[in-house]
Regions:
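Conserved NTP-donor binding/palm subdomain of two-metal-ion nucleotidyltransferases/polymerases, i.e.
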Residues: 1-82, 88-246
């Protein structure tokens, strides 16, 4: 993203006296970008395959963060990839055993059909590796085990996931769900706040927030957002992210 910005800037205001980017530095950056684009293509293909697999088995796959947020970047495949975060819901919950939620049934299916071992040692998601990429299958949006106060947030997020979402179709016809703009705004802000409190906030996470809000701000109920942001204790943090992003 830095190289994209510099290329745009240098195109309109070329550096004088050969004070631009050194040739070797630019070649190094270009190599990194080409690798990033290759990884993004692989990432996209794996997500589409998983979405098709789950849909055929009767599950709707909601994609959290990552690939969905890359769609708001000026050049989507220049957003670095990471693991794949998903949240699964039954396409038809009638007759389903409520003691075995969608994520649990889907993990069993992954093992039975694909022979993939699933790690269930984590607090609010299971983990497995599909074609070399780590997948986190979330049964919670937030970790309700770490703080009891997170439970009302979890209920809020799950209600929004069930009642409001956006469908996305890949070129191969596979379909998945993205969170609604409101849920995305709350979830990404909360995720960033937790990361900042625990360790740090990196440039990619800040750009995810800034570019998403810039594009979808008209689709967000801001009264609802700020009411819940205050209740979650992250109002000042969100204001700081917004101020830095301007």
């Amino acid at each position: 993203v830095v190289l994209d910005g510099l290329n745009k800037s240098l195109a309109s205001e070329p550096c004088q006296d050969n004070k631009g980017i050194g040739k070797m530095d630019k070649l190094k950056w270009l190599s990194m970008v080409l690798n990033m684009e290759r990884q993004y293509t692989i990432h996209e293909s794996v997500i589409a395959e998983l979405a098709a697999f789950y849909r055929e088995a009767g599950y709707q796959m909601m994609l959290l963060k990552g690939y969905g947020l890359s769609k708001y970047w000026p050049i989507p495949n220049h957003r670095p990839t990471g693991d794949i975060d998903i949240y699964l819901m039954f396409m038809n919950s009638e007759g389903k055993d409520k003691s075995h939620p969608a994520w649990e049934c889907a993990d069993k299916l992954i093992t039975e059909k694909l022979g993939i071992q699933v790690d269930n040692s984590h607090h609010h998601h299971s983990v497995f590796t599909y074609k070399g990429i780590m997948v986190e299958n979330h049964y919670d949006f937030v970790n309700v085990h770490s703080h009891r106060s997170n439970r009302w947030i979890e209920n809020e997020f799950k209600t929004l996931a069930l009642t409001r979402n956006e469908e996305y179709t890949f070129d191969n016809g596979a379909k998945l769900l993205f969170p609604s703009p409101l849920l995305n705004c709350l979830f990404v802000a909360r995720h960033n706040a937790i990361h900042f409190a625990a360790e740090h906030l990196n440039l990619r996470q800040l750009l995810d927030w800034a570019l998403f809000v810039e594009d979808r701000h008209k689709d967000i109920d801001w009264n609802y957002f700020w009411k819940n942001a205050k209740k979650m204790g992250m109002e000042k943090f969100v204001l700081c992210m917004s101020f830095i992003s301007i």
